[in-house]
Structures are given as structure tokens and as C-alpha cells.
């Protein structure tokens, strides 16, 4: 993530450990970068699922005893869980921290326009590279679903539609590429004298 630009870095959350990814994202935001994290429901948590569920249910019980409507408010959506993890690593009560958080976007699934953008991964936060193969882990999406998040089926449906649309697009692009190669072969002999002239001026054909 070196070389800051105004362009938003789109990170695919699938297969990343939540805390490790949050620390990398928090540091990048404080350096002035813009980040969008998609597919937060496929982030991973190390440890057995039931252990993580018990911890999260204990976290949900932390509320104002006099009037629970005062807060604190505990979000169930995977994207908001990740957002809060990042927020905890940033001085969010200062102007600098607020500006950093304003540069963060988090999403469940891959909404438009990020479905057409190049997505990257963070190797130092990926589960397959950082967690021992015999260690237990669980998905944030499953945890969220079991503690009150109601949109797991909606996100899965939207993801199926997106992947079906992507398969059609890729098939069309492959066919177009074949036609382009065939067209070049068909005109190769006729275009040879023109290519020589272009090359004489120092251009590559």
C-alpha cells in the first residue's frame, strides 16, 4: 500500500483476518489514503465459532443499566463490526481521526461501482498465510447472522447474481479477443507495407 494517491484502494475482505486487516487499513487511513473494503461478511475470525459467539453475546450485554436506549449501540452487520474494529485503532475523537474515518467505506457484498474496480488483497492479513493450518476459525457473516443480522440471504442472492453477470461478461470478452486475433491474422499480409512505414518512424506495431 505504498505510494498514496487520490484513488480509492478497494480491498476484497474474503479470507482476511478481521483484526489484522483492520490494523493495516487504520494505518493507511491515518497516512491519508482512501479505502473501500468489500465482502466484509467473508472476513474471518481466529478461534472456534462458539467461542467467538459467546464473546460477542457478552459484548452485546454491555449497555446502560438505567436506560438501554442511551447506548452503547452494538451493530450486528459484518461491515459495521469491521468499521468499529478500525475505529478502535484510530483517535476517532480528534479532527485527524474523524478525517481518516471519513475516507473509509465498508460494504457487505460487492455493490456498484466497486464490482467493476480492481480489487486487492493484503498478504500480511490473509488467514492462509498468517494462521496455522490446524487452528479453528469462523466467518464474520455467520456470527452476525446468529446474533441478529437479517440480510445474509439477501447478500448471498445479490452475490449469485453478480457472479452470473460476471461469467457472461468474461465469456463475451474471450469471444471478442478471439475475433480480434482472427481479424489481425486476416489483414496481416495487406497491412505489412503500412507496418513497415510506421516502424520506419520509430513506432512499435
From Swiss-Prot:
GO molecular function: mRNA binding; structural constituent of ribosome
Keyword Transmembrane helix set for record: no
Top-level lineage group: Eukaryota
An example Gene Ontology biological process: cytoplasmic translation
A GO cellular-component term linked to this record: ribosome
Keywords, alphabetical: Ribonucleoprotein, Ribosomal protein
Similarity section: Belongs to the universal ribosomal protein uL13 family.
Name of the protein described by the UniProt record: Large ribosomal subunit protein uL13
Upper classification of the organism: Eukaryota, Metazoa, Ecdysozoa, Arthropoda, Hexapoda
Annotated gene: RpL13A
